[in-house]
Amino acid sequence: MFAFYFLTACISLKGVFGVSPSYNGLGLTPQMGWDNWNTFACDVSEQLLLDTADRISDLGLKDMGYKYIILDDCWSSGRDSDGFLVADEQKFPNGMGHVADHLHNNSFLFGMYSSAGEYTCAGYPGSLGREEEDAQFFANNRVDYLKYDNCYNKGQFGTPEISYHRYKAMSDALNKTGRPIFYSLCNWGQDLTFYWGSGIANSWRMSGDVTAEFTRPDSRCPCDGDEYDCKYAGFHCSIMNILNKAAPMGQNAGVGGWNDLDNLEVGVGNLTDDEEKAHFSMWAMVKSPLIIGANVNNLKASSYSIYSQASVIAINQDSNGIPATRVWRYYVSDTDEYGQGEIQMWSGPLDNGDQVVALLNGGSVSRPMNTTLEEIFFDSNLGSKKLTSTWDIYDLWANRVDNSTASAILGRNKTATGILYNATEQSYKDGLSKNDTRLFGQKIGSLSPNAILNTTVPAHGIAFYRLRPSS
């Protein structure tokens, strides 16, 4: 039995034009980097951060855009007599300024963590009521990014206004320091953050914490479906759970302020290769931050080749900043072991007049899927040039780095990294304008008016395309 959903949304001006003034000039594209929490949790140290940064650089990932090295919870040992935070000397013997300087000297950016509560989620000192002292601590230690959590908030939530003012206090304090600091809210979407986040922050989490499961329900993540206004966000939320919650929120994100679907689980847990590809593709397409959650010293070749797929990253870093829209959604009868099964089609405009299209199979069997120009350009009027033109179809995964080459790179063969796109030398925007083939995938055909785009999509997998006006 099928159930059908078709999206007809009132799009904000931000969604139409892809323009949102960044409140602090940062976050013009979604942030990319690495965060320790998903793999290491509280097992953090100076050595972990610096070794990870060196490895990310050696793997060519820094020059693909993964430049933020984000230290999560558990770094503090308390406060000094003046009320300033103190780093744990056992974990960070040279202090946070040393970490920042090492990262900056190697062209990385340094991120740290606190919580808009009395304590952090792991029970360390929080920043509620201490915003100015703590913002100055971060600025003094040359921090470039703050992840700001939501634990132990003393009940200061329940309406958008209450949460807004609690998070605005740190926003104001960061700005007062005079240091540009990317401000990443982690309040789990509580109190409709997507409505007010862009006025005070550069990104905002929109759900409970992700887990390395594609569809598995979990009682600790009680809301599902399209419950974007979840009263108890929880954690251990599956990839499809978070994606469906994010579906209506794209109209409230754009340049300078992004919906954050949480860190990437590629290379974490036991996701299949098709699930990892779908996960990475959809996070890229909806313009979520691309934050590696894996241990980069222990990546398998297939996961590395996903993180380094320039044609997919280029979708995420597209300068117009418009998240893709879910155009349709069907439930299907071939459910998986958890009773989950659905298929979806997503579409979104790109800066150079191209269009990104995804056919997502959340069912348990491989299946034929299709779409048309009328669905792809669902907002266009009949007779629109988009509907009467022929479009070339590029498979965004067709030129993926093979496992042999990925293994060579992981084995520290620096020559092998020469095939990778280098966004430090040439931005994604410039590479697209110069038709760098690494950013387009492989042309597999064309789609003419009244024709149908047909493909076969594996279970828990994706077909991911860039459409370009036919040459």
Curated annotation (Swiss-Prot):
* Entry's EC annotation: 3.2.1.22
**Chain positions recorded as substrate binding sites:** D72, D73, K147, R205, Q251
Q: Which residues form the active site?
A: D149 (nucleophile), D209 (proton donor)
Instruction: Return the Pfam families for the record.
Output: Melibiase_2, Melibiase_C
Catalytically driven reaction(s): Hydrolysis of terminal, non-reducing alpha-D-galactose residues in alpha-D-galactosides, including galactose oligosaccharides, galactomannans and galactolipids
Q: Which cysteines are joined by disulfide bonds?
A: C42-C74, C121-C151, C221-C237, C223-C230
Q: Which UniProt keywords apply?
A: Disulfide bond, Glycoprotein, Glycosidase, Hydrolase, Secreted, Signal
Location of the protein in the cell: Secreted
Keyword Secreted found: yes
- Where does the signal peptide begin and end? 1-18
Q: Name one GO molecular function term.
A: alpha-galactosidase activity
Indicate the quaternary assembly.
Homotetramer.
Name-wise, this protein is: Alpha-galactosidase 1
Source organism (scientific name) = Saccharomyces cerevisiae (Baker's yeast)
